[in-house]
Structure formats: structure tokens, C-alpha cells
Swiss-Prot record:
Entry GO terms, CC: tRNA methyltransferase complex
Catalytic reaction(s) noted: guanosine(46) in tRNA + S-adenosyl-L-methionine = N(7)-methylguanosine(46) in tRNA + S-adenosyl-L-homocysteine
UniProt name for this protein: tRNA (guanine-N(7)-)-methyltransferase
Family: Belongs to the class I-like SAM-binding methyltransferase superfamily. TrmB family.
First-level EC class: transferase
Organism listed in the record: Neorickettsia sennetsu (strain ATCC VR-367 / Miyayama)
Keyword Transferase: yes
Length: 217
């Protein structure tokens, strides 16, 4: 059952960005982002799309979202990422494959979710978010109850949310948070080729699939 708690979902941008580390690698060249503007997502653009929309939060270097966009050209894939090297890599591949069904949100995804006024997403992937393993940094973890509550406002009925991590402690937090928001939470298998994080995972991969049932709201 969807549980709506009285929480203040409108947080300042500076609070959001504490969830992220360094935003660009060394020796990054700005010309790698040429052409990004025409692929940028906005809440107005998403609210006016007629196609099925899939969101990936933190796409890294874009392996997963790229493959999905190639395999499902009738769907629109929105990738949210703050790391500019990853954005540049995905942008390069999108142009190489001449894809027209990829949009990029190059900032904290919560800033986008706050602006959305209607149900837009049919599926959401959150694959290997930064676990911030040190206890004093746990508050920087992006996946928690307030995040799921914020996300749920933009989910279509019966939309699926898939989350994966190889950090056992974070997995427990994700699972308990999901139980407070989603009507259905179950284990799901995450393929090793889902991303470079999955392929390099030395620990067990914990995968969860949540189903949002708007009738329980």
C-alpha cells in the first residue's frame, strides 16, 4: 500500500547535490558536450510526450540506457546523471547510433521530479547508486523513503521501479524504504552486463522490483 507521510519534499538544490561526489573527471574537455542542448530533458517536454517513458537514475557511462534505447525505439528513455564524463560518453553513442529516443537530465534527478505535475514514467531503473559506505555519509544516499515518495508522484499506475546494489547495508535500507511506499516489492535478477558496475561487482548483487499501485494512494 502506498503510504504518504507528511514530509517536506521541497529541498534546496544544495542539499540534493550532497548525494553526489565529483561531477567531472580530470582533463575533461568541454567540447565533448557540444550538441547536448537538443537532448536535454525538461518537465514540459516529458509532460507532452505521447510515448512510453522510461527513466534511468544515475546512468554512469550509459551502457544500460543505450542498449534499451536501441532495443526499444518506440519508447523514450530519460537518463539522469550529474557526472559530465558519463554524459559525454552517452551523448557520443546516441549520436553515433543516430538515436532520437534519448533525453538527458544533467542535474540532480530530484530537481526534475519536483517539477513534474503529472504521471509520466512507466518504468524506472536505479542501478548501483553510490552506496556512500562510511556511516557518516549514509545521509547522502539518494534512495530512501522521501525519494521514493517523490518519485511515486510521477509514476503511472502499475509502473515498475527496479533498483540494484551490491552493498548489503544499502540493500537493506532500499528494501525497507520501498516497503513503506510501494504495494509490491520483490527480488529481481540483475544481469551482469547491465552496466560496468554490475560486471565488476565483487559482492552479491541485490535487485528489487517495486510496483506502484495508484489505487492504494
Amino acid at each position: 500500500m502506498f503510504v504518504h507521510n507528511e514530509v517536506n519534499l521541497r529541498l534546496e538544490k544544495k542539499q540534493f547535490l550532497r548525494s553526489y561526489g565529483r561531477r567531472r573527471g580530470r582533463n575533461f574537455r568541454e567540447n565533448k558536450l557540444v550538441g547536448l542542448e537538443r537532448f536535454l530533458a525538461s518537465h514540459e517536454k516529458l509532460e507532452n510526450l505521447k510515448s512510453e517513458i522510461v527513466l534511468e537514475v544515475g546512468f554512469g557511462f550509459g551502457e544500460h540506457i543505450l542498449k534499451k534505447a536501441i532495443d526499444y525505439p518506440d519508447k523514450v528513455f530519460v537518463g539522469a546523471e550529474v557526472y559530465v564524463n558519463g554524459i559525454a560518453r552517452l551523448l557520443e553513442q546516441v549520436e553515433l547510433h543516430e538515436l532520437s529516443n534519448v533525453l538527458i537530465w544533467n542535474d540532480d534527478v530530484r530537481l526534475l521530479l519536483e517539477k513534474l505535475l503529472c504521471k509520466v514514467f512507466h518504468k524506472v531503473y536505479i542501478l548501483f547508486p553510490d552506496p556512500w559506505p562510511k556511516r557518516r555519509h549514509h545521509k547522502r544516499r539518494i534512495v530512501d523513503v522521501p525519494f521514493f515518495q517523490l518519485l511515486s508522484r510521477s509514476l503511472h499506475p502499475l509502473a515498475e521501479v527496479v533498483v540494484a546494489t551490491d552493498d548489503h547495508d544499502y540493500a537493506q535500507q532500499i528494501y525497507q524504504s520501498a516497503l513503506e511506499v510501494f504495494s509490491k516489492v520483490e527480488n529481481t535478477e540483475i544481469p551482469k552486463n547491465a552496466s560496468r558496475f554490475a560486471s565488476k561487482a565483487s559482492n552479491r548483487i541485490f535487485g528489487y522490483k517495486m510496483v506502484y499501485d495508484a489505487t492504494d494512494a
